[in-house]
Swiss-Prot record:
It comes from Vibrio campbellii (strain ATCC BAA-1116). Belongs to the elongation factor P family. InterPro entries: Elong-fact-P_C, NA-bd_OB-fold, Rib_uL2_dom2, Transl_elong_fac_P/YeiP, Transl_elong_KOW-like, Transl_elong_p-like_YeiP, Transl_elong_P/YeiP_cen, Transl_elong_P/YeiP_CS. This is Elongation factor P-like protein. CDD domains: S1_EF-P_repeat_1, S1_EF-P_repeat_2. One of its GO terms (biological process) is peptide biosynthetic process. One of its GO terms (molecular function) is translation elongation factor activity.
Amino acid sequence: MPKASEIKKGFAIESNGKTLLVKDIEVTTPGGRGGAKIYKMRCTDLNTGARVDERYKSDDVVETVEMNKRAVVYSYADGDEHIFMDNEDYSQYTFKHNEVEDELLFINEDTQGIHLILINGSAVGIELPSSVELVIEETDPSIKGASASARTKPARFASGLVIQVPEYIATGDRVIINTTERKYMSRA
């Protein structure tokens, strides 16, 4: 069984008799020498859908749950539900908006590399690729000669995602975004 420091976003863990899907991990180091890092994991209870926070020290052993991944593409939205289609057998998987709302910020019809997470044969979540390519919907006008400065400005995408981009980026530019850190990487 892995230690808490080896757990990543998207892992399924077992805690207090509950099966949890790790949505986000926050690492803090308490003051003082030799203080072990504390991993605060924001999870979703796969049975109830409730959000659960778990805390572990870096050397705590965490019980993981075996899971399978299948390549899928975003198909369409139907009211409050979002449908993903399996790339191999074309079966469809439906998620409520609140179950995948964080992931939807990085997804459009062209997004490749999305994986469906299956535990005991049932779909429990989706995993994003490490980076995605999106088109900027709205940002302040670009400033000529600003490429040498490290100043940034907010940029909004069609999905509602807002991140900081360099000043020389303009509306309509295709950019590559790191999905785990929610940061601009480069122009596409």
